[in-house]
C-alpha cells in the first residue's frame, strides 16, 4: 500500500526535505513506498490528514532559533483525531537567492516568516533598508525574482538548484546550529515510543492551579523536557499549557500521572507517544 505524505510546499521547502528524509527512512526500514503531496499551507496539510484524504503529514513543530510553530500546536489542540507518531530533526540552511549582481541592488526580500526571523540579524546587518515581505513558504517568493532584479528570497541552497536561481549568499542563518523538529502526524492512535506530548487547560485561573498540575509529574520524578503556554483564544488571560515529557503513556508512573492530571484540568489532550527517528 502506497503511503501519501502531506507537507508545506511547493518543491524546495525545508518541509519537503523532511518529507523526503522520512520517505527514505520508510523505504529503508519498512519497504514502504510513499507519495509526496505538497500543500500551500501547514494548516491545509494537517486538514487533509484529519479529513482522511492523506495518510500522514510532515510538519515543523519547533525551530532552535524561533521556537514553536504555533499553528501546528493550535490545530492539534482543536482537532480530536490527529496524533503524533514520529519525530525527526533536520539542520536548516538558508541562503539569499537573487538575480541581482550585488547586495546593494536588493530592495525587497521574500520568505516565510520563520525564514526571515531565522536570518534577522544577518538581514539587519547587510540589508538594513530592504522591505521584508512574508510568504506562505520559503520557496513561494522565488517566483518573483526573475521579473524583479532588485528582489531576493531567503530559501535553501537546494531550492536554488531546483529552480536554477543564483545563490547570491550561501549561508545567512543567524546561528550555525540552526535546526528544526518535524512531527509525523496521522489519524491512527499513537501509543509507542519514549516521548509524549500533551496539552491541557485549567478549569479556572486560580492561584497555584498550574503548580498543582506540574507537581503531579514532579512527585513521580517524570522529566518534563518542555513547558509552554498558548492563548486559549477564548478570553484574555486564559491559556493552554503544552508539555513534552520522556516516557510512554503505558508506563505505570505516567499512567497514574495522566489519570491524576485529568482530575484537575478542564481539558486534557494527548498529542501522541512517539519515537525520534535517527535521521542525520
PLM region descriptions:
Residues 1-280:
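Domain-level signature for soluble enzymes in the chorismate/prephenate branch of the shikimate pathway
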Amino acid at each position: 500500500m502506497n503511503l501519501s505524505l502531506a507537507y508545506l510546499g511547493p518543491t524546495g521547502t525545508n518541509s519537503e526535505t523532511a518529507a523526503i528524509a522520512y520517505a527514505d527512512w520508510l523505504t529503508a526500514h519498512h519497504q514502504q513506498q510513499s507519495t509526496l503531496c505538497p500543500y500551500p499551507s501547514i494548516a491545509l496539510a494537517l486538514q487533509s490528514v484529519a479529513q482522511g484524504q492523506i495518510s500522514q503529514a510532515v510538519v515543523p513543530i519547533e525551530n532552535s532559533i524561533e521556537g514553536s510553530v504555533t499553528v501546528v500546536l493550535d490545530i492539534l489542540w482543536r482537532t480530536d483525531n490527529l496524533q503524533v507518531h514520529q519525530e525527526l530533526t533536520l539542520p536548516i540552511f538558508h541562503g539569499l537567492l537573487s538575480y541581482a549582481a550585488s547586495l546593494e541592488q536588493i530592495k525587497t526580500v521574500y520568505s516565510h516568516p520563520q525564514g526571515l526571523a531565522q536570518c534577522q540579524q544577518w538581514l539587519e546587518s547587510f540589508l538594513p533598508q530592504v522591505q521584508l515581505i512574508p510568504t506562505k513558504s520559503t520557496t513561494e517568493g522565488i517566483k518573483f525574482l526573475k521579473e524583479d532584479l532588485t528582489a531576493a528570497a531567503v530559501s535553501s541552497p537546494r531550492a536554488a538548484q531546483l529552480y536554477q536561481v543564483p545563490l547570491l549568499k550561501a549561508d545567512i542563518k543567524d546561528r550555525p546550529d540552526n535546526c528544526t523538529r518535524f512531527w509525523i502526524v496521522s489519524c491512527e492512535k499513537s501509543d509507542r515510543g519514549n516521548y509524549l506530548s500533551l496539552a491541557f487547560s485549567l478549569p479556572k485561573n486560580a492561584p497555584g492551579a498550574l503548580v498543582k498540575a506540574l507537581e503531579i509529574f514532579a512527585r513521580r520524578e517524570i522529566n518534563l523536557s518542555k513547558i509552554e503556554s498558548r492563548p486559549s483564544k477564548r478570553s484574555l488571560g486564559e491559556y493552554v499549557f503544552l508539555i513534552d515529557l520522556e516516557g510512554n503513556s503505558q508506563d505505570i508512573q505516567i499512567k497514574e500521572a495522566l489519570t491524576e492530571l485529568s482530575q484537575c484540568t478542564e481539558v486534557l489532550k494527548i498529542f501522541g507517544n512517539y519515537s525520534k527517528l535517527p535521521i542525520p
